[in-house]
Amino acid sequence: MERPILPKGLPEDIEDKKAVAQAWFQHLRDTIVASFETLEDELTGPLSDQEPGRFVQKDWLRDNGEGGGGKMSMMEGRVFEKVGVHTSTVYGEFSPEFRKQIPGAEEDPRFWASGLSLIAHPVNPNVPAVHMNTRMVVTTSHWFGGGADLTPVLGRRRTQQDPDTQLFHRAFEITCNRHPIADYPRYKSWCDEYFFLKHRDEPRGTGGIFFDWLHPDEEKGGWDANFTFVQDVGRAFNLVYPKIVRANFNQNWTEEDRDEQLIRRGRYVEFNLLYDRGTIFGLKTGGNVESILSSLPPVVRWP
């Protein structure tokens, strides 16, 4: 999607809005962490004789704390081979080369950004991998962005007719339809367009939603309406993805399934390192490299 020209100017209470958004992202992180640890406890199928995983949290600082920081929450368990649920709030100035790519940064390079990012790589190949993030960005303008997408790793499950994919799509369609400022058909198409490996001419997964540059429209409720939608995206994710995990995590799998999973993970690596805007943004703004690259799966294979 082509980047729009966003109105410039910040509301008088922008600092209050920043604080509210940051607090929400941290609350959502804690909610998802608890939800995923519950999934670890509930496993009764393969590997249920192993200890359930628990998140390990680690704080990090940008520019020795002068540019903000964040909290990494990582878990390696019997349901999730690797999952990261990270929050960050960073601020500073964009580099000259990066200013032209960010709305409102050409005239004034100062920025503030806060958000949550999650990527989960399950152990069981029957359970799809997933990504979700939501964020608020402030320059001389301000906006929200985010989305969620599903990546089944088995070819027989990587279809639009698969019940996991249909449940995932339906959850976000319902969420978008509750908010006049949201546009589900556009966000769904945007997701398909964004999460696409051009060099392989194939999608990364089976889609979801993706949105960016969501700027307040006072006729549709302004900042509050946008923020409420972003909150509901997080809530919808925390409802639908655990349902998908529970529907699959007790199933058996074969060595061939595991091999296919590892090859599909390779596509994940290719996308994140070649195309992902969040990865590029984090690396170019002095983000925490360990946190940024924690999205990569723990074990991968290329044929």
Curated annotation (Swiss-Prot):
<dbReference type="InterPro" id="IPR018375">
    <property type="entry name" value="Coprogen_oxidase_CS"/>
</dbReference>
<keyword id="KW-0560">Oxidoreductase</keyword>
<keyword id="KW-0963">Cytoplasm</keyword>
<feature type="binding site">
    <location>
        <begin position="133"/>
        <end position="135"/>
    </location>
    <ligand>
        <name>substrate</name>
    </ligand>
</feature>
<dbReference type="GO" id="GO:0046872">
    <property type="term" value="F:metal ion binding"/>
</dbReference>
<dbReference type="Pfam" id="PF01218">
    <property type="entry name" value="Coprogen_oxidas"/>
</dbReference>
<keyword id="KW-0627">Porphyrin biosynthesis</keyword>
<keyword id="KW-0350">Heme biosynthesis</keyword>
<feature type="site" description="Important for dimerization">
    <location>
        <position position="199"/>
    </location>
</feature>
<comment type="similarity">
    <text>Belongs to the aerobic coproporphyrinogen-III oxidase family.</text>
</comment>
<dbReference type="GO" id="GO:0006782">
    <property type="term" value="P:protoporphyrinogen IX biosynthetic process"/>
</dbReference>
<feature type="binding site">
    <location>
        <position position="121"/>
    </location>
    <ligand>
        <name>a divalent metal cation</name>
    </ligand>
</feature>
<dbReference type="InterPro" id="IPR036406">
    <property type="entry name" value="Coprogen_oxidase_aer_sf"/>
</dbReference>
<comment type="function">
    <text>Involved in the heme biosynthesis. Catalyzes the aerobic oxidative decarboxylation of propionate groups of rings A and B of coproporphyrinogen-III to yield the vinyl groups in protoporphyrinogen-IX.</text>
</comment>
<feature type="binding site">
    <location>
        <position position="199"/>
    </location>
    <ligand>
        <name>a divalent metal cation</name>
    </ligand>
</feature>
<dbReference type="GO" id="GO:0004109">
    <property type="term" value="F:coproporphyrinogen oxidase activity"/>
</dbReference>
<feature type="active site" description="Proton donor">
    <location>
        <position position="131"/>
    </location>
</feature>
<dbReference type="InterPro" id="IPR001260">
    <property type="entry name" value="Coprogen_oxidase_aer"/>
</dbReference>
<feature type="binding site">
    <location>
        <position position="131"/>
    </location>
    <ligand>
        <name>a divalent metal cation</name>
    </ligand>
</feature>
<keyword id="KW-0479">Metal-binding</keyword>
<feature type="region of interest" description="Important for dimerization">
    <location>
        <begin position="268"/>
        <end position="303"/>
    </location>
</feature>
<feature type="binding site">
    <location>
        <position position="117"/>
    </location>
    <ligand>
        <name>substrate</name>
    </ligand>
</feature>
<dbReference type="GO" id="GO:0005737">
    <property type="term" value="C:cytoplasm"/>
</dbReference>
<feature type="binding site">
    <location>
        <position position="169"/>
    </location>
    <ligand>
        <name>a divalent metal cation</name>
    </ligand>
</feature>
<dbReference type="GO" id="GO:0042803">
    <property type="term" value="F:protein homodimerization activity"/>
</dbReference>
<protein>
    <recommendedName>
        <fullName>Oxygen-dependent coproporphyrinogen-III oxidase</fullName>
        <ecNumber>1.3.3.3</ecNumber>
    </recommendedName>
</protein>
<feature type="binding site">
    <location>
        <begin position="286"/>
        <end position="288"/>
    </location>
    <ligand>
        <name>substrate</name>
    </ligand>
</feature>
<comment type="pathway">
    <text>Porphyrin-containing compound metabolism; protoporphyrin-IX biosynthesis; protoporphyrinogen-IX from coproporphyrinogen-III (O2 route): step 1/1.</text>
</comment>
<comment type="subunit">
    <text>Homodimer.</text>
</comment>
